[in-house]
Amino acid sequence: MSIVVKNNIHWVGQRDWEVRDFHGTEYKTLRGSSYNSYLIREEKNVLIDTVDHKFSREFVQNLRNEIDLADIDYIVINHAEEDHAGALTELMAQIPDTPIYCTANAIDSINGHHHHPEWNFNVVKTGDTLDIGNGKQLIFVETPMLHWPDSMMTYLTGDAVLFSNDAFGQHYCDEHLFNDEVDQTELFEQCQRYYANILTPFSRLVTPKITEILGFNLPVDMIATSHGVVWRDNPTQIVELYLKWAADYQEDRITIFYDTMSNNTRMMADAIAQGIAETDPRVAVKIFNVARSDKNEILTNVFRSKGMLVGTSTMNNVMMPKIAGLVEEMTGLRFRNKRASAFGSHGWSGGAVDRLSTRLQDAGFEMSLSLKAKWRPDQDALELCREHGREIARQWALAPLPQSTVNTVVKEETSATTTADLGPRMQCSVCQWIYDPAKGEPMQDVAPGTPWSEVPDNFLCPECSLGKDVFDELASEAK
């Protein structure tokens, strides 16, 4: 069944209430989706996009109920991905000579999916127009890498409707088509989820492309997206949100996520969160176990956050696989203006936290001090985790902290013995980690104030796991 969008524009798309996976299994569409196709009937009849390939036959049959297929004069393909152009083969089998208007890159993508180079392709570029009669034109705007190289938008003069492709859309299924008809909380939650998980890597392109489109000085009464609602009520509100999200977006929020084998790393996460909340009660803190949480919700929270803490147990000297996979995905999303800290527990040897810190730094995060615990953290170790959270809260504060938290008393780390009496600091000759007698190494039950001579012989360097024999007196303190 078609829905009138405006005047002679009809929605002829497909709702998909059941879909739960998108882009393979990388995006969870918890509220379904829609594949929006539009039929414009003027002196010339234009079809903008089709639907997902799994609905090809149903789409063509429904379209035949709306219009004699032979009366379709032009097909516009804003994007060649299968959820947009998937029904082309089924449709073109009925009307093989119908002109297809798309970008040059789209021809490559369409042929790659459908293998019909004989189709009547017509390449368009930014500023090109197509007269469709009754004084109306289609104006094409290339939008490469938002989010594919072939992407473009199409603007209809007279009706002032922007067919925006993936931009401004959301994977959200509802019987109502327009933004003012649906649950606003659900809608904007899905808009942000969509941007965070799909468009974040291209944020540097969003602002100049929107500026370019606004530079045409064309009125926009509606934005007709490829997924989700049509924006008819104050359509520029979603444009303003995109400009905000593209500008290195962050809220006063910290996301903590982890994976754990024996709940030790979970205990650390809880204690760190307590320290953050104790020091800065204004900050929102969200905690996720990656094995039990929706990955896209985690990534959306990272997008919203000023920083994140990532925890992992050590398994075979490396991080847990789910954490490794999530870090790889964040590398591709190219988050900006975010801070990060790694933490985790280990047994006889470590390695995961250092590896995780390196990977997070490579992913573009500004790194803060990491934290490790050996075996199951006891009360002293948990207090160190809380203190780590307090320090993170202080370092990452976006505004001066409330005075009551600035003066929080922190447990003294050094004994009454003077630093000089404790002897020199010792440095690992392999990884350069420094043992400070004044601080000790509580994770290995070496109390603050323990001189090197009293450190147990089974002590291991926290960074490289080698023994005491690789340590030398710190050069700057050698006599």
Swiss-Prot record:
Binding site for FMN: 260-264, 342-369
Keyword set includes Mitochondrion: no
Cofactor detail note: Binds 3 Fe cations per monomer. Binds 1 FMN per monomer.
Binding site for Fe cation 2: 83, 166, 227
Residues annotated as transmembrane: none
Domain (Rubredoxin-like) ranges: 423-474
Location of the region described as Zinc metallo-hydrolase in the Swiss-Prot/TrEMBL record: 30-210
Keywords (A to Z) from UniProt: Cytoplasm, Electron transport, Flavoprotein, FMN, Iron, Metal-binding, Oxidoreductase, Transport
Lineage: superkingdom: Bacteria
Residues given in the record as Fe cation 1 binding sites: 79, 81, 147, 166
Pathway: Nitrogen metabolism; nitric oxide reduction
Family matches, as InterPro entries: Anaer_NO_rdtase_flvorubredoxin (IPR023957), Flavodoxin/NO_synth (IPR008254), Flavoprotein-like_sf (IPR029039), Metallo-B-lactamas (IPR001279), ODP_dom (IPR045761), RibonucZ/Hydroxyglut_hydro (IPR036866), Rubredoxin-like_dom (IPR024934), Rubredoxin-O_OxRdtase (IPR016440)
Residue intervals of the Flavodoxin-like domain: 254-393
Family annotation (SUPFAM superfamilies): Flavoproteins, Metallo-hydrolase/oxidoreductase, Rubredoxin-like
Cell compartments where the protein resides: Cytoplasm
Record-linked CDD domains: flavodiiron_proteins_MBL-fold (cd07709), rubredoxin (cd00730)
Known partners and oligomeric status: Homotetramer.
Function recorded in the entry: Anaerobic nitric oxide reductase; uses NADH to detoxify nitric oxide (NO), protecting several 4Fe-4S NO-sensitive enzymes. Has at least 2 reductase partners, only one of which (NorW, flavorubredoxin reductase) has been identified. NO probably binds to the di-iron center; electrons enter from the NorW at rubredoxin and are transferred sequentially to the FMN center and the di-iron center. Also able to function as an aerobic oxygen reductase.
Protein known as: Anaerobic nitric oxide reductase flavorubredoxin
Lineage, top ranks: Bacteria, Pseudomonadati, Pseudomonadota, Gammaproteobacteria, Enterobacterales
